[in-house]
Amino acid sequence: MQHTLTLDVETTTFQKGNPFSRRNRLCTVGLLDDAGYRDFDIEYTNTPYGGKLQTIKEIVEASTLLIGFNIKFDLHWLRRYIDELSVHAVWDCQLAEFILAQQSNPYPSLNDTLNLYGLEHKLDTVKLEYWDRGIDTTEIPWDILAEYQKRDIVGTREVFEIQKKRFEEGDPRLYEMFKLQCKDLLILQEMEFEGMVL
């Protein structure tokens, strides 16, 4: 039986949240599965987070399919904080939309994808009232940040359900190609994270 888990992280914003910049921090991790929605304060505050990372690791490793939007970004962040994280399979909704749109839009945004499917759009408050004004993630009130992240995760999950149906009802070769590209994404994430000895 498939156990799907939807993931989203929120980070500090230096270089667009670059996970390879030591200046950045992982602020929150949000997860959604059949057990419901959970969010975890990692470095949003200064509270200890080791136990939370262990819980996240257990939840992620128990899933058979990890869903996200531009999921390689989220995986880089999890790998930075969690050693030896085992991910069985991923579904990148951004990659799926690129394939389903016949590669006409290489980097569709979550908001554009939500709008395309007639779903509730992202909450603009965090971007417009905080990030665009130079206010970093740790300075955003928790209730606003938590609501923003939850809406992103719920929206990503809704997009996944629509995309899955579209793939299942469409050309099976396209679906197989997408699954293969998701496997490739995991390998690419590993290569980018580990680097190369030259």
Predicted segment positions?
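Long, highly charged low-complexity segments
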Residues: M1-G17, T55-I56
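Active-site-proximal helix-loop-helix substrate-binding element of RNase H-like nuclease domains
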Residues: Q15, N24-E168, L180-Q181, L188
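Non-catalytic accessory segments adjacent to catalytic cores
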Residues: E168-D171, Y175
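Residues at beta-strand starts and edge strands
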Residues: H3-L5, R25, L185
